[in-house]
Amino acid sequence: MARMQGCSVLVLDDSDKLVNKYDHKVTVVCSYDPQGMAVRLLQEGATPPKQLEEYLVSGAGTTHLSRGHTSHMLVVGGELVLFRFASRGDCQQFRSLLHKLSGKVNSVFNLRTEDSSASQYFQFYGYLSQQQNMMQDFVRTSTYQRAIYNNAQDFQNKIVLDVGAGSGILSFFAVQAGAAKVYAVEASNMAQYAQQLVSSNNLTDRIIVIAGKIEEIDLPERVDVIISEPMGYMLYNERMLETYLHGKKWLKPDGKMYPSRGDLHVAPFTDEALYMEQYNKANFWMQTEFHGVNLVALRDAAMKEYFRQPIVDTFDIRICMAKSIRHTTNFLTADEKDLHRIQIDVEFHMLETGTCHGLAFWFDVEFAGTCSQIWLSTSPTEPLTHWYQVRCLLQTPIFVKQGQVLSGKVVLAANQRQSYDVEIDLKLEGTMISSSNTLDLKNPYFRYTGAPVAAPPGSNTTSPSEAFWSQLDAQGARNAVNLVNGITVNGLGEVDMSSTIINTNLMAIGGGANGGGPGGHQPNIHPGLISSTGRQQQQQQQQQQQQAAVGPQQQQQQQSTTAQQLAMTPPIGCAATSTQNVAQHQLIGGAISPSLFTSPAQPILNSHHHHPGQPIHGNQFY
């Protein structure tokens, strides 16, 4: 930010003569803006400072002309403005900023990005609500934290670059791990909020916030580590990974990158319900008498449009018909030009017979530190993140048989809208059957509703009804043993639904051994929701008879015990677990916690139970 005081501002009047726009001097403040440079005019002497005018000076839409040693003329938005500075030094400083701005017009970022797309992009990430959306993704944020903490050796007394810092949360993690200095580069207006957080946390000497694009800013020194969260849907969307790779021009030889590698997984899937959902949307245009109008002429165009939309949601991995193909990008060795066109050759050996409706995508990234390797996964087998998973439909599905080979390619072609066109070509080997589709990753269909993921049809190998009643009978038989202890149960045990009957189609909540509360049990149906069987009145009568046969002291003890039990009983409709409120109110990406829909227990930091992203065996994580 640059400030030039004692400046006069002149404009053309109706007779095309230069006249003073204000009857007083102003202070000219120049600051970074995602679209160029913001020039603000402040009234001098006003408390608090009063802004009189603001001009957005962009390299492409602004004409500027020197007028002597102390004056400079701009044409902004059709208005001619002459700045007459108090000194030659102030004028030279202003011209220097304009000169740098003209150089930014041809930056790598601007050459590959439409102005309208960049404007929307930086506006989106300039909202605190969007930063909160990402920060509340527990898996994302905690895995980054764990990766940095577990590899503190890579950060202690090191210089770190945070590319696309946003709120600065990763910069804070780096400092907490011992970093000597962090350059937090952020191109959106979020940079000012990041600066406020740095100042309020008394870290201005260790975190330097730089407002600007990594392709356009200068650093005073090279860095030891680059950290960033550059992943989008299907890993590559938003083309932020190219910016991340561009930052390597500031990385020392043998420097570290967090993350260091990305794997995009591709698998064929079957989902008749999803296919018909999209298909039926287009059938709206089959109407021949819609308020007297025949819509049929647009039906084919509508069908093509709906099937060009990638589907963003989550699913049961059992809908995948073959093992996923993995495409790896090593961030340490890859060049940003490698991401302009990404071709993935696929060959799927089908594991089951059915209709292939398209390809499913998800990604994993690795933090290859000196002390440990941590993985962040968006697989459908892992807790849900704000990246979800992505599915690309074929307008013409392919029927396949177990043992057949489905081959072809997936091409991600980068466009200037900070996204990709996804081209899919598949062929069933040994036949003439093939199908292809081109999708627009910039225009996805956000289908996720927060509902539990349903198992694919045909997943039950036993009768769910018989299993339910068998468990109910078994629990009743076990509780009948209570008769030995003198507890009246009217011939049948009181059925405890909370510990035995767990619907296998619903996933557990929380942090116990079996995904439940402190005791490891999480009920999906609370016993308070089950209507009385008629034995309650008989039990009350027999309890009254028993109380009449005991002394007053024993009655008082029984009443005390009953009161304690009632105090510990959760409200009707609530799960009997102490972790309920924590799990049910924890938000992920502004939506619903993945812990509500996944069977793994909720990770708890700084405990010996679960650490998100920390590998144990194979692809399993704590």
From Swiss-Prot:
Modification after translation, per record: The dimethylated protein is the major form.
Pfam families reported in the protein's UniProt record: PrmA (PF06325), PRMT_C (PF22528)
Name the record gives this protein: Histone-arginine methyltransferase CARMER
Leader peptide range in chain numbering: none
Biological-process GO terms, alphabetical: chromatin remodeling; peptidyl-arginine methylation, to asymmetrical-dimethyl arginine; regulation of DNA-templated transcription
Binding site for S-adenosyl-L-methionine: Q131, R140, G164, E186, E215, T243
Complex and partners: Homodimer.
Region feature Disordered, mapped onto this chain: 513-556, 602-622
UniProt function note: Methylates (mono- and asymmetric dimethylation) the guanidino nitrogens of arginyl residues in proteins. May methylate histone H3 at 'Arg-17' and activate transcription via chromatin remodeling.
Enzyme class: transferase
EC number from the UniProt entry: 2.1.1.319
Keyword Transcription regulation: yes
Catalytic activity, as annotated: L-arginyl-[protein] + 2 S-adenosyl-L-methionine = N(omega),N(omega)-dimethyl-L-arginyl-[protein] + 2 S-adenosyl-L-homocysteine + 2 H(+)
Keyword Transcription regulation listed: yes
Alphabetical UniProt keywords: Chromatin regulator, Cytoplasm, Methylation, Methyltransferase, Nucleus, S-adenosyl-L-methionine, Transcription, Transcription regulation, Transferase
GO cellular component, one term: cytoplasm
SAM-dependent MTase PRMT-type domain residues: 118-425
UniProt family annotation: Belongs to the class I-like SAM-binding methyltransferase superfamily. Protein arginine N-methyltransferase family.
One Gene Ontology term of the molecular function aspect: histone H3R17 methyltransferase activity
Modified residues (Asymmetric dimethylarginine): R478
Location (main, coarse): cytoplasm
Localisation: Cytoplasm; Nucleus
Biased composition (Low complexity): 536-556
InterPro entries: Arg_MeTrfase (IPR025799), PRMT_dom (IPR055135), SAM-dependent_MTases_sf (IPR029063)
